[in-house]
Amino acid sequence: MVRTKKTDSFFESYRMEAAPRKGDGFTQKDFALRNASWLISDIMTDRHAKKGRREGFQAPISNDTPVSDEKVVYKKSEDASLEIKKVSKFFGADLCGITGLDKRWLYSKRVDVRDMSEVDLGLPDGLTHVIVLGHQMDKDLVQTYPSALGGAATGREYSHEASIVMQIAAYIRNLGYQAVASMNDTGLVIPMAVQAGLGEYARNQLVITPEFG
């Protein structure tokens, strides 16, 4: 994405005070729902902003739990994959795929949001696989874009995702393995999702899944 005044205005609209007006999808209640839907995502994103980390969007999410000194050993990698998929569904993910880490899709740098400078991505050693999740948005609300209600559909799933990826990463670290929670911040998720078997690459440069399109 190229940063412009229009892109800045778009993202700022999610952080400014609501400006209700007449019309379906733009009332005070509609903006209240949108802002509440983004709350958990915003809390996670802002918690280390003073350190230059806008986590989940421009930096990987910081670990909240250490890697256990005692490692759970699996007889087969398939057993570990099946377990992670079950745990992902338990935490609330609609789709879960796993693939090997392809470093072609990782960003070479991240941005320090204090001065917009480039800094190291800061991923730990020992990462070998990528867990890719899918979340179903409310179709009826999505179809109301560009209303505040459309933003509520997006915000709800970003907040869900923030919680889910942190929980999965914590689970894996408690098993004795390194894991980093990530959203839109670490690499190109579209090719990762395709490699993880969640769907096919579409002409609109997104992933089309059998379940949700």
Residue ranges and their predicted role:
Residues M1-T99, K103, Y107, V113, ...:
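Iron-sulfur (Fe-S) cluster-binding modules
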Residues K85, F91-G213:
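Catalytic cores of enzyme domains
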